[in-house]
Each structure stands twice: as C-alpha cells, then as structure tokens.
Curated annotation (Swiss-Prot):
Name the UniProt record assigns to this protein: tRNA uridine(34) hydroxylase
Organism this protein belongs to: Lactococcus lactis subsp. cremoris (strain MG1363)
Catalytic activity, as annotated: uridine(34) in tRNA + AH2 + O2 = 5-hydroxyuridine(34) in tRNA + A + H2O
MF terms (GO), sorted A to Z: oxidoreductase activity, acting on paired donors, with incorporation or reduction of molecular oxygen
Source organism, top-level taxon: Bacteria
Alphabetical keyword list: Oxidoreductase, tRNA processing
Residues of the Rhodanese domain: 125-219
C-alpha cells in the first residue's frame, strides 16, 4: 500500500516577538509531527514549505491555526508521491524577503492591489499592462506567464536596481507582478508603489494558486513552475503544456534541472541526461576539469575515461 503525501506552501506576514526562540520551539513541534521541510522565521513573519503524510500535514495546519497569529494563514496544498524533503529545518532570519533596501517595506502597511486568478488573467490581456516576473532567472527559464518580462537578475535582491535601470519603459503602464506563492510580491509590489508606479497589482496566492483555479486552469502559463524542493518542477497549465525551457548545451526543449558539477559554481541549468553525461555534468570547460567535479566522483569515472570524454567533446565542438 502506497502512502499518500502532501506538500504545504504558506507564508504569513505578522509580528513575531523573539523570533529565534519561536524558531527553536517550532522546529521541535515539526519534528514531533514527523514533518520534513524548510521554514524561515523572522520578526516580520513566517514562510514555509513542509511535507508529510495527510495526517501529519493536517496536524500541522491545526497546530498553526490554533496560534492566533496564524489563524488567517492560507495553505497551498499539493499531493505528492513521497516526501519532498529529506530533513526538517526551521531557521531564523532578520527578514523573510531580502530586497536589499535601506528602508524596508512593510507589506502590512504598503503593498500592491491583490488580484485573484481570474482578475490577473484578464489584466494580462490588456495591452496597457506589463507583467514583471519577481523570481530569479532560473525560475523564469523553466516557466512563466506568456509575455512576462524576465529581469536580468540572479537573485531577488537585485530586482530593485534592475527596475530603477529600466523603469522608463513601463513607468506609465499598469504593472502586474507575480511569484511562486505570493510572499515576494507582497514586498516588491509595495516597493513599486513607493517608487511612484501608479497602478500596481499582484497575483494573490502566487502561481501556485493560479494553477489550481477551476475556471482559469493555469491559462496563459507556459512551461512549469520551479519549486524549492525535490520535485523541482510542478505543472500549472491544465489546458496545454508548452515547453519553454532550453537545454544549456544545445538549446533544445528541456525541463530537467541539474546543478553544475563544480561545487564552487553550482549553477542551476537545464540539461538532458545525454548532455549531462556528454559534458561531464558541468557548465563550462573550467568546471568540467575542476578537481572536485561531483559528476565525475558520483559516476566513479577514471582519469582515462574523463580524458577520453574531454577529447571527444573537444572534437565535437571544433567540428
């Protein structure tokens, strides 16, 4: 008999006094329930993804709802074949979302207008609307809303500077923004309002909610949604599946993520199993020949085998 598992994604902006002590106690509670996952706690709130059996996840939601600070917390629930995490971590951080701002934004005081999935879809179709993806580049590359702008950033904290450098092209437009579950957009949309953007909207509940809406059914989403657990990719569009990801090495359609074999690089890239083997699991020649290449170690390749593959690769690239 197979065990049914679930993955819970949630966040709540709410003041938490002595966040460090709360994080320690919350870790004990999660372990007692048998959960696995990753939770961030800050003085400004909580953000987590946890997985476990139906019984365990139900118990966790009850635990949270019994705390007056989290009675309004919305849990996005995904069915899963197995645990999405190997361990349970609860960590304290100074803030849940880092935009590297001198004067941080409090979403409880300033944030963009909330749009439900149907409203967001309708707004995307307006020609006077621009849609800005508030996630990292590797998340966008796996999947995104059709026509969305891809900021040239490697991390969320680089987004404000990118907006400042490019704001002239959409300052007078209606600006919509979205992210995985909604937490990043709460701050980012508030910052856009503070920067002087007149009409700012955010996808309430994020992509995760959009994909489950029975009417919208993930329409206008291409690719898959990147998630920060062992699943990596989650389907969103229930009407059609358009692959937008491209293999790092040959540009062919691909939705399989790997990390560069060089632990000092660790770049996330899309690659087929064939290309991962051909290129020794590394994004560049420098990373392929790195002495700690994890792909070479994991597959126990001898030095002779490595040299033979490198020679074949050099010949192929030269042709």
């Amino acid at each position: 008999m197979t065990q049914d598992y679930r993955v819970l994604l949630y966040y709540q902006y709410v003041p938490i006094e002595d966040g460090e002590s709360f994080a320690q106690k919350h870790l004990s509670d999660c372990k007692a329930l048998g959960l696995k996952g990753r939770i961030l706690v800050a003085d400004e709130g909580i953000n987590g993804t946890v997985s476990g059996t139906v019984e365990q996840t139900n118990a966790y939601m009850s635990l949270m709802k019994n705390d007056s600070r989290f009675t309004s917390t919305i849990f996005k629930i995904d069915e899963a074949k197995q645990n999405a995490f190997k361990k349970m971590h609860v960590r304290y951080r100074p803030e849940l979302v880092n935009l590297s701002l001198e004067d941080d934004v409090n979403p409880l005081e300033l944030t963009g207008a909330y749009l439900d999935p149907k409203e967001f879809r309708e707004a995307m179709l307006d020609e006077n609307t621009v849609v800005i993806d508030a996630r990292n580049d590797y998340e966008f590359d796996l999947g995104h809303f059709r026509g969305a702008i891809r900021p040239e950033i490697r991390s969320f904290r680089e987004l404000p500077q990118w907006i400042r450098d490019n704001k002239e092209q959409f300052m007078e437009k209606r600006v919509l923004t979205y992210c995985t579950g909604g937490i990043r957009c709460e701050k980012f949309s508030g910052w856009l309002v503070r920067e002087g953007f007149k009409d700012v909207g955010q996808l309430h509940g994020g992509i995760a909610t959009y994909g489950k809406d029975p009417e919208v059914q993930g329409d206008l989403w291409d690719g898959q949604m990147y998630v920060f657990d062992s699943r990596i990719a989650v389907p969103i569009n229930q009407k059609e599946h358009v692959i937008v990801g491209r293999d790092w090495f040959d540009g062919s359609p691909c939705e399989r993520y790997i990390n560069c074999g060089n632990p000092e690089c660790n770049r996330q890239m899309l690659a087929s199993k064939e290309n991962e083997a051909k290129y020794l699991g590394a994004c560049s020649h420098e990373c392929r020949v790195h002495p700690d290449n994890r792909y070479i170690k994991a597959h126990q390749l001898s030095n002779q085998e490595v040299q033979e593959r490198l020679a074949l690769l050099e010949k192929d690239l030269a042709s």
